């Protein structure tokens, strides 16, 4: 997935169980729970499309990490919130509402008008309209609401 936003998103969707059970026919073919990560999906023969080996410990949590950190770009580390999005080219913007203790972070991420996104795109981060150096904010449980704007250059 490194160096390709589109590939990362494609692979994420490929293993996302809901993508295999959007219709009644797909769910009948998939045959496993549409809310649990499947370890494998048959690709050939009359079992093609069927899921197998569900309920692996940890796979759901890694799916969340992959989506939040490596695609949406949200990272919480050492008491800081940072954003480093790697979204596919057809996404123009998205929002995340993140709650930390009594704090609410309303995060809006948008591509600079006319910009495409490469894997190494630079971002600018603003908190309540103030530019944030190093694109990270210290998490403090002060009960405030913060409006974060992230602009993909």
Describe each model-derived feature in a short phrase:
Residues 1-153:
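Non-catalytic C-terminal accessory modules of carbohydrate-active enzymes
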